[in-house]
From Swiss-Prot:
Family: Belongs to the CoaE family.
Cellular component GO terms, alphabetical: cytoplasm
Binding site for ATP: 11-16
This protein's name: Dephospho-CoA kinase
Gene name linked to the record: coaE
Catalysis performed (reactions): 3'-dephospho-CoA + ATP = ADP + CoA + H(+)
Subcellular location: Cytoplasm
CDD domains membership: DPCK
Superkingdom of the source species: Bacteria
Gene Ontology MF term list: ATP binding; dephospho-CoA kinase activity
InterPro entries according to UniProt: Depp_CoAkinase, P-loop_NTPase
Any GO BP annotation: coenzyme A biosynthetic process
EC number assigned by the record: 2.7.1.24
Organism taxonomic ancestry: Bacteria, Pseudomonadati, Pseudomonadota, Alphaproteobacteria, Hyphomicrobiales
Amino acid sequence: MKIIGLTGSIAMGKSTAADFFKQAGISVFSADETVHQLYKSKPILSLIEHTFPGVVENGKVNRLKLSKILINDSEKLQTLEEIIHPLVQEKEKEFIDTARQQGKKIVVLDIPLLFEKKGEKRVDSIIVVSAPLAIQKERTMTRPDMNEKKFSFINAKQMPDEKKRERADFIINTGKDLENTHQQVFSIIENLLKN
């Protein structure tokens, strides 16, 4: 079974590309979705509330409050990552084990910080989703609760797009229309199934 890492900086179109893989019948593990699921778990909620008092409201993590804390304190960001990342990797391993048992030929791991967290060692090939900076910024600024400071903070935590592209086995350029992105995904799937 081939394990493919799908990565890209914020607002590059990674989720759209992941959806196209799913539509083609490829199993996709989403690190972000897994984090959101973990945030609903009572033990994790308790741990987050204990570590970051006031960010859990009505049984949910207030992600806006949490992000405001993390933007201003890199040690707290590291603390959160130490809590969450091992649990995400555990879920990733379960996903891979299940896919192997099901006889899948290819699986995709959608991991935003694949390079930054040394995840490239866990995959056979890497796909980087990329778009021109102007498009990336335009997409980012349409997100709720996004501003220049938060955009700069997130970008600073991520490897520059050009470096990711240099390390990629495949690049999906999402700067054009959705049909173009879909065709690129389809071509990559064909290539992976042949080799």
